[in-house]
Amino acid sequence: MSLNKTIYEGKAKVIIETEDSSTVIQYFKDDVTAFNKEKYEIIEGKGIINNHVSAFIMEKLEEAGISTHFINTLNEREQLVKKLKIIPLEVVVRNIAAGSFCKRFNIKEGEALTSPIIEFFYKNDDLADPMVNENHILYFGWLSHKEMEEVKTTTLKINKILVDLFSNANIYLVDLKLEFGKLINNSTKIILADEISPDNCRLWDKNTHKKLDKDVFRLNLGNLKEAYSEVAKRLSVKLD
């Protein structure tokens, strides 16, 4: 890991300062958590896989016209990214019923949704990331109405691109969690932040519905590293 000052450490990544005030280093850890940190393990090599998979996906999104914080990969665990003021929201888009969605609405896992459903959650571990609606978002000033529409439009575009990308790898994109931020030197520019990897996507094999994401860890379904490596392999992402 870089010897520069750590700005922030989360559950799966560390953000490290650089000499350029407009960029930071994003370091991918091997830590795996579930149920708001109630379940925890270190799985050697997990961070390396996520670094490469996320870089690959961010590059695909940039090619498709989506603005992201990704600049380039520095090494097996680190990326250079644009420094952002993170919007304190997790934006979840669902294509197939799974996880908490099934529990909240008593719906069977695996039911295809007629169209993608977007949900917002307030990023706050102490409050267990509560679900919020657009009125909450406006009241607390996290986004303006115009910005909210921009985030929703961008989210659906990202979802469409990734549904197709994973489908070509014989994988269903069940749902995914996105985060956005504003450039430090341009408070009106909202771009995609964080990562896109098996850590924050639900991914199922299209033939067997075998889980290839963090649910393998959550539900004790097998070897997490093997599942993540399978995703990388199907996307033709090189890990060395």
From Swiss-Prot:
The similarity comment for this entry is: Belongs to the SAICAR synthetase family.
One CC-aspect GO term: cytosol
Read off the Pfam families from this record: SAICAR_synt
Q: Which gene encodes it?
A: purC
| UniProt pathway | Purine metabolism; IMP biosynthesis via de novo pathway; 5-amino-1-(5-phospho-D-ribosyl)imidazole-4-carboxamide from 5-amino-1-(5-phospho-D-ribosyl)imidazole-4-carboxylate: step 1/2
Entry keywords, A to Z: ATP-binding, Ligase, Nucleotide-binding, Purine biosynthesis
What Gene Ontology molecular-function terms does this entry list?
ATP binding; phosphoribosylaminoimidazolesuccinocarboxamide synthase activity
* An example Gene Ontology biological process: 'de novo' IMP biosynthetic process
The protein's Enzyme Commission number: 6.3.2.6
Gene3D superfamilies for this protein: ATP-grasp fold, B domain (3.30.470.20), Phosphorylase Kinase, domain 1 (3.30.200.20)
Q: What is the name attached to this protein's record?
A: Phosphoribosylaminoimidazole-succinocarboxamide synthase
Q: Does the keyword Nuclease apply?
A: no
InterPro entries xref list: SAICAR_synt/ADE2_N, SAICAR_synt_PurC, SAICAR_synth, SAICAR_synthetase, SAICAR_synthetase_CS
